[in-house]
Amino acid sequence: MQARFHTSWAELPASLQFALEPILSAENFPAMLTAEQVKTVKNISGLDDDALAFALLPLATACALTPISHFNVGAIARGKSGNFYFGANMEFRGVPLQQTIHAEQCAVTHAWLRGETNLVAITVNYTPCGHCRQFMNELNSGSELHIHLPGRPPSTLGQYLPDSFGPTDLAITTLLMDPVNHGYTLAETDPLTQAALNAANHSHAPYSQSHSGVALETTNGKIYAGRYAENAAFNPSLPPLQAALILANITGENCASIRRAVLVEGHNAVTSQWDTTLATLNALGCSAVKRVTF
């Protein structure tokens, strides 16, 4: 079991520990539970979906990376597939606070990167800020996404964000988590570049059409790819680097262990991820950063 879970693990009920131990002790635990694992854990622990999501929050919170605020937030995104996905907030020294990732953004993006195509609920240990409410408003779940908070009855996103502005106001019909493939190609055969290209092809950028993807290679040779997630309100858009860092951190990778990185984007796109990607990666200690355009 990863060391970051030890403190939270000790506080779990014995029945839940018994149910989760084989899952969390796996060498490459991906910070998610499959639908089958969720079913098994519920049968052993006696918890239902809502109670299990709340019980998992301390483990998700243990994934937080907060060198600035030291305020850890965890989230569990529940997919229509039945899978549960961990999320936690992430902060980075030496770059603007705008590069911060909120726990809800992390859980949603984690689910998206794992292939989830629709969310039914998100459970979080603190009320979602306005930024996160707007970010989630881009989802194909729409205002019916259920939000669960400790000590409160479940509410919908529509109740947390009344009279919202979203994709439909801009006549956008392809929503975040809808399956897409933009069909871009590159001649380069480098696996890291191809991973970034694949991410760009599945990115969500209906407002600028500036599709982009980032792939990170760590010192142990693992590759983590992230896609751009654009938002109708523009500012809550999540850059592809942040998506890649989400996948790396949530699975237990050290974000300071990135050996090289590739950004793939359009050569004449109206917005570019290059400057912020380079600056953030440099702050994390990675200088081998490459930009490839289609």
From Swiss-Prot:
Catalytic class of the enzyme: hydrolase
Family annotation (SUPFAM superfamilies): Cytidine deaminase-like
Listed CDD domains: cytidine_deaminase (cd01283)
Catalyzed chemical reaction(s): cytidine + H2O + H(+) = uridine + NH4(+); 2'-deoxycytidine + H2O + H(+) = 2'-deoxyuridine + NH4(+)
GO molecular function: cytidine deaminase activity; identical protein binding; zinc ion binding
Textual note on the cofactor: Binds 1 zinc ion.
Record keywords, A-Z: Hydrolase, Metal-binding, Zinc
Superkingdom, natural source: Bacteria
Family matches, as Pfam families: dCMP_cyt_deam_1, dCMP_cyt_deam_2
InterPro entries: APOBEC/CMP_deaminase_Zn-bd, CMP_dCMP_dom, Cyd/dCyd_deaminase_Zn-bd, Cyt/Deoxycyt_deaminase, Cyt_deam_dimer, Cytidine_deaminase-like, Cytidine_deaminase_bacteria
Physiological role: This enzyme scavenges exogenous and endogenous cytidine and 2'-deoxycytidine for UMP synthesis.
Assembly and oligomerization: Homodimer.
Record-given protein name: Cytidine deaminase
Gene it is expressed from: cdd
